[in-house]
């Protein structure tokens, strides 16, 4: 029997790519964030793993607020079930540098990374060993969705080309950027 996976984030770059990569291997469904909360407890109780790929614009840009923490809201709904949750955190929770490891120094600088670290702690507290935290790098790839203009934040490439168009080459102040292809 195939594992049942539910991906939340039907309109997201990561969610769509994850769904397409896993659809032949698992019994997988993809829904948007609002639709997730309309799923019955009966159906949720049969899910093995939930992966949230949706995010609030306010979560990215503003100070932490529980109402903007979609992962925590999902956690609250699934806490009573036995399903696991995969949390997509960020390598930005670490002090900038190369060769980062799980035990590298944590030093989030922006609201996004500070919020991710707070969510990690809240999910770990609530779900204990039922949460897998992945501190992923910058994901790049071709966005085949029709929602390209619905970006929550700019990528390194977006910023780079924005400056190039203005004939500005910027110094990265020893900030490290790492990129992983979405389809590898």
State where each predicted segment sits:
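Structural motif
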Residues: 4, 48-49, 84
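NAD(P)-dependent short-chain dehydrogenase/reductase
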Residues: 122-176, 182-183
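A short beta-strand-loop structural module common to alpha/beta enzyme folds
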Residues: 28-37
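Conserved Rossmann-fold NAD(P)-dependent oxidoreductase catalytic core, especially the SDR/UDP-sugar
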Residues: 73-109, 132
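Active-site loop/turn elements of alpha/beta-hydrolase fold enzymes
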Residues: 33, 55, 90, 136-139
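NAD(P)H-binding glycine-rich loop region in Rossmannoid oxidoreductase-like domains
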Residues: 36-73, 77, 92-93, 97-98
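N-terminal Rossmann NAD(P)H-binding glycine-rich loop of SDR-like oxidoreductase domains
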Residues: 3-23
């Amino acid at each position: 029997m195939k594992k049942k996976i539910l991906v939340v984030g039907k309109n997201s770059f990561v969610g769509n790519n994850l769904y397409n990569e896993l659809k032949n291997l698992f019994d997988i469904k993809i829904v948007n964030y609002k639709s997730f909360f309309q799923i019955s407890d009966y159906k949720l109780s049969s899910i093995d793993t939930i992966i949230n790929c949706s995010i609030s614009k306010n979560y990215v840009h503003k100070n932490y607020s529980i109402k903007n923490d979609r992962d925590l809201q999902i956690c609250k709904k699934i806490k009573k079930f036995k399903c696991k949750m995969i949390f997509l955190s960020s390598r930005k929770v670490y002090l900038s540098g190369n060769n980062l490891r799980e035990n590298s120094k944590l030093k989030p600088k922006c609201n996004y990374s500070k919020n991710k670290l707070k969510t990690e702690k809240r999910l770990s507290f609530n779900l204990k060993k039922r949460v897998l935290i992945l501190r992923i790098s910058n994901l790049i790839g071709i966005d085949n969705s029709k929602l390209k203009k619905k970006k929550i934040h700019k990528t390194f490439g977006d910023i780079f080309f924005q400056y190039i168009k203005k004939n500005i080459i910027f110094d990265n102040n020893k900030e490290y950027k790492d990129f992983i292809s979405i389809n590898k």
